[in-house]
Structure formats: structure tokens, C-alpha cells
């Protein structure tokens, strides 16, 4: 069996994968970014463009930052976005000066880059030379309660930007029944962005009242025993035009059903994926919630166990119709909830959902967790709401009242899933240990090390990781082995293309993957394969031992 060994620079531990054969990184990009270890942010998103370039981001607060030709001084805990080529050589960088944190990066087929994240107060967006490109104004104070959406060209020019800032509903604020700090209680945030269908999709959690491109985003308020108003967040998958970030469509929303509600409940976590025009969403909620799309409105409720709300794990497919299914997870098995959806991934047959849980069931499967919570991957058959399998980490991180697990990445490397995350001390969010698992597409799990990986991306040529070592951000690239033939990207005589149909000299198995390594099409024992239903983009066709890169 082949193995992947991902060695993280100065780190002593080693991370292994059942996908390829790496003994060391092919490149490493390291930058001093923090004044002290306690300043570190447990988030450093990465993505790989259609051309194979690598886009990374990190927070920084260490005086002057010099990276990729950019020289700037930190304002509060700022962030930067950097472009590297496929070999890890810096191309350019831009900064977000102020209390800003990039949560997710994605790109389109032209190499344009999109970023979503959160910020507080005032943030200056710089050019590659450090001059001001634009300014964002959010709520005053230090709480990162405002949302930004950014678009850059492949050369680092700021092409478009949007922001949203929330405030307390005027009627609620004037009622003398609202006792929260408005700068903390009213927020709009995002943690994931995906480019697809010439749209930019991103998730959003929001309370209070805000708007983006003239469309209102409004949370709910529970009038608790007619004594006080309590904020109840909504969560949505939103989309804007990828060309200029204009317009706003609520593709999918989960909100609380407030009728008769006497206790605080609602949606707490949501993630999504988009594939061939279909939106896939998974979320976690308690109490009665309403799921809204353009073609369906449905109320779902996991109910109660005695006086305690059960946790509902919700899975949805949204296309010309909407199919929702709620799985009763039961009540909490510990004092602290750690039920979350952290990533979704789609191949030609399945949708993979990654997250954490500490209930008795997760997506209908009774899987016993260890310690404060377990990480999991669940597989759903595309076109249905049927669970194929669920695997859990089985990591016992210790005292359930003090520790929990966090999932940081789920990608495909050589047709296998790579799941990364870490355990943390919940009161301070201090990282304790890392974990890495290989999961086959049939649900077999293999433990693969204990490195702390904060960000993860892959394409057909390499896996890219991010992390923090002492005061430094560390980005590593690991080339995929040539033994799979994935790097043999030339058309051969026995693989012939005619329009959107590939023909083969003899019947054999064929697989098409995108540049993120995801399987998007598969056929067995065939002499031809149509790619007519694929969206426009760059793909790799693997036939037997050969591979052909093509553009649809």
C-alpha cells in the first residue's frame, strides 16, 4: 500500500496518508506573524486555483510585515492574503489592516480570488505595494461582528468588495427589554466561500438587522417570558454575482420557528457544497426550525427528551426541488455542546459531511464518541438523503467538560479522503493535539498522525497545508506521486477527444477529477465517456494508467 508522509517543517511529528508517497514537503513558506504564542489564531485558510497557484492567508500582529513584496505595519490583529506559485514561490501579497480575519478562500477558472471573513471597527484593504485600495467600516469596538466579501484578480488587484454590519432591531432596542451589548450581540459572519456557476456562494450566520447589496438579513428575537429579548441567529447560504459581487440571493435559510417557543434554541452550525448546479447543505439545530429555499418551506423538529432539546442533524439537497431530512441526534451526552458541521465535499457518487458531535447519534447512526466529542465523516448517496456510512475519530481528548475536537479540513487525495483537525481546551481555545485520518470512499478509517493542521487544500498535483509553529505561519506543499499517472497530462493515441466525448482504444475504467482532486465523473468498463454535463473548468481524465488534462 502506498503512503503519504507530510513532514511539517520544524515540527517533530509526522502525518501519514494512504494516498501517495511523500517523505518531505516539496516547498515550505514560513513567515513570522505573531508577537507571542498566545496571539496565534487557529485559522489560516488555503486554496489552490485552476492553474495550480496556491492562495494562503494568515493573521499577524508583529510590527512590520514583509511578505511577497508587501511591507506594512500591523493594526490590531490584521491579516494578509498571499499568492504563491505551484512551487511555493511568493508572487504577491495584500493586507487587511485592522481587526480582520480571513475565514475562507476560493477561486474561479480565470484565477480570480475570493475571500470572506469578519472584521471589527475600521479595516484598510491595501494594494500589493501597501497603499490604500479601499476602506471597510464596521461596528466600533473590538468584536469581529461585521462581514466582508472580497474579489481580487490573479495579479492581486482589488476588483470588488462588499461588507455588512449588523445592528439591534430598533423596536427591540427601544423596548427596555434588551440587556446585551449591541456591539457583541448583533453580528453577521461567514466561514466558507465557494465559486460555482459564475456565482460566489458563502454561508452566513446573523443576528440583529443587516443588509448586503440592499437585501435585508435579519435574525430573530425571542421575547423570553415577556421579560427580555434574546437574540436567535439565522443561518443561510447566500450567493452574489461573481463578476462584481452584486445582487444577493438567499439560496437556503434555516431559522427558528418562534411560535410557542419559550426557550432559546435554533440553528447553531451550517456548511455546504455546490456541484453541477446542486446545492448540498448540512446543519445542526435544536427545537423547531424552518428550512426555506426558493421552492420549498418546511418545518423540522427533533423534539425533546424530558426537559432537554434533542439535537437535529439536517441534510438537504437543493436543485429544481428541495429534499430535506432531519436525523434525531438525541440529547447532549455531556454538559457542553460540540455539535458542528465543518465541511462538505462532493464526488461523482457521494456527498461527504465532516464535523463534530457529542450526542448519542449522528445522522441517524449510533456511534459512540470519546472524551468531550468526536470528529466524524458521513457519506450520503447523491440524489438521496440516504446515509451510506459514518466513521468517527475515536480520539479521547480527556475531561469532557474541558476539551473538545475541531475539524479543520476535508479533501480528496488520490481518491481517498483526508480529514484534519485538533483537540482544544474549550475555555481558552488552546490547541492540545492534532489528528489526521485517511478515510476511504467506502468508509474505512486509518489514523495517520497527530500534526495540527489549520488549513487544507488539494488538487491533482499536490496537497497544501497551513499551520502555526511558535510565532510563525507555516505553509507546506506536498507533490503527489507520479506513480498514479496523474502528472502525465498529455493526450495519447488510445485516448481521443471528439467534442465533449472521449473515446478509448479498449474498454476500461475511467475517472474524471477536478483540480481540487474531487471525483466528478466515473464509468466502468467503457470505451467512451461524455463530459457534456460537467460545468466549465479544468479537469483530469484518468483512464487505466494514463491521465489527460482537459478544459470543458
Language model: regions and residue ranges:
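Bacterial Sec-dependent N-terminal signal peptides
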Residues: 1-24
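C-terminal tail/sorting-segment detector
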Residues: 3, 161, 536-552
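A sequence-level/structural motif corresponding to short, flexible coil/turn segments enriched
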Residues: 20-485
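Well-ordered beta-strand positions in beta-sheet-rich domains
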Residues: 93, 477, 528, 547-549
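Terminal processing/anchoring signals of secreted or surface-associated proteins
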Residues: 482-494, 512, 517, 539-541, ...
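Glycine-centered tight-turn motifs at strand-turn-strand junctions
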Residues: 519-534
Amino acid at each position: 500500500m502506498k503512503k503519504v508522509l507530510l513532514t511539517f517543517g520544524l515540527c517533530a511529528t509526522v502525518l501519514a496518508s494512504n494516498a501517495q508517497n511523500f517523505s518531505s514537503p516539496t516547498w515550505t513558506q514560513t513567515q513570522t506573524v505573531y508577537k507571542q504564542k498566545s496571539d496565534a489564531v487557529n485559522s489560516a485558510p488555503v486554496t489552490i486555483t485552476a492553474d495550480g497557484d496556491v492562495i494562503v492567508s494568515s493573521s499577524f500582529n508583529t510590527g512590520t510585515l514583509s511578505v511577497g513584496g508587501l511591507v506594512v505595519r500591523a493594526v490590531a490583529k490584521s491579516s494578509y492574503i498571499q499568492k504563491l506559485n505551484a512551487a511555493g514561490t511568493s508572487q504577491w501579497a495584500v493586507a487587511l489592516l485592522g481587526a480582520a480575519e480571513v475565514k475562507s478562500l476560493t477561486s474561479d477558472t480565470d484565477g480570480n480570488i475570493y475571500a470572506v471573513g469578519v472584521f471589527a471597527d475600521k479595516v484598510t484593504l491595501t494594494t500589493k505595494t501597501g497603499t490604500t485600495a479601499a476602506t471597510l467600516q464596521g461596528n466600533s469596538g473590538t468584536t469581529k461582528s461585521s462581514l466582508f466579501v472580497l474579489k481580487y484578480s490573479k495579479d492581486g488587484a482589488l476588483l470588488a468588495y462588499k461588507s455588512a454590519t449588523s445592528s439591534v432591531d430598533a423596536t427591540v432596542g427601544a423596548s427596555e427589554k434588551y440587556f446585551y451589548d449591541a456591539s457583541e450581540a448583533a453580528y453577521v459572519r461567514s466561514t466558507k466561500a465557494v465559486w460555482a456557476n459564475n456565482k460566489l456562494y458563502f454561508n452566513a450566520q446573523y443576528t440583529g438587522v443587516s443588509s448586503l447589496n440592499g437585501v435585508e438579513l435579519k435574525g430573530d428575537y425571542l421575547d423570553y417570558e415577556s421579560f427580555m429579548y434574546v437574540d436567535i441567529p439565522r443561518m443561510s447560504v447566500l450567493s452574489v454575482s461573481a463578476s462584481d459581487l452584486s445582487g444577493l440571493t438567499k439560496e437556503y435559510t434555516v431559522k427558528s420557528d418562534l411560535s410557542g417557543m419559550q426557550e432559546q434554541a435554533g440553528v447553531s452550525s451550517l456548511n455546504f457544497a455546490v456541484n453541477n448546479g446542486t446545492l448540498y447543505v448540512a446543519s445542526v439545530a435544536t427545537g423547531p426550525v424552518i428550512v426555506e429555499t426558493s421552492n420549498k418551506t418546511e418545518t423540522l423538529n427533533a423534539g425533546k427528551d424530558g426537559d432537554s432539546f434533542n439535537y437535529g442533524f439536517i441534510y438537504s439537497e437543493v436543485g429544481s426541488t428541495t429534499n430535506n431530512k432531519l436525523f434525531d441526534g438525541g440529547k447532549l451526552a455531556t454538559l457542553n455542546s460540540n455539535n458542528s458541521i465543518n465541511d462538505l465535499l462532493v464526488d461523482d457518487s457521494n456527498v461527504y459531511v465532516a464535523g463534530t458531535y457529542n450526542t448519542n447519534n449522528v445522522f441517524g447512526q449510533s456511534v459512540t464518541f470519546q472524551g468531550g466529542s468526536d470528529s466524524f465523516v458521513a457519506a450520503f448517496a447523491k440524489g438521496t438523503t440516504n446515509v451510506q456510512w459514518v466513521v468517527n475519530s475515536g480520539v479521547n481528548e480527556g475531561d469532557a467538560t474541558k476539551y473538545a475536537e475541531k475539524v479543520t479540513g476535508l479533501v480528496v487525495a488520490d481518491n481517498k479522503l483526508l480529514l484534519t483537525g485538533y483537540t482544544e481546551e474549550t475555555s481558552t481555545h488552546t490547541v492540545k493535539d492534532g489528528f489526521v485520518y485517511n478515510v476511504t470512499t467506502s468508509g474505512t478509517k486509518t489514523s495517520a498522525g497527530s500534526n495540527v493542521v489549520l488549513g487544507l487544500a488539494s488538487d491533482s498535483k499536490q496537497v497544501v497545508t497551513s499551520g502555526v509553529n511558535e510565532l510563525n505561519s507555516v505553509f507546506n506543499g506536498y507533490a503527489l506521486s507520479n506513480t498514479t499517472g496523474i502528472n502525465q497530462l498529455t493526450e495519447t493515441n488510445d485516448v481521443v477527444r471528439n467534442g465533449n466525448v472521449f473515446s478509448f482504444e479498449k474498454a476500461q475504467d475511467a475517472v474524471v477529477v477536478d483540480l481540487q482532486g474531487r471525483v466528478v465523473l466515473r464509468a466502468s468498463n467503457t470505451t467512451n465517456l461524455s463530459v457534456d454535463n460537467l460545468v466549465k473548468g479544468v479537469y483530469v481524465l484518468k483512464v487505466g494508467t494514463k491521465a489527460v488534462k482537459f478544459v470543458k
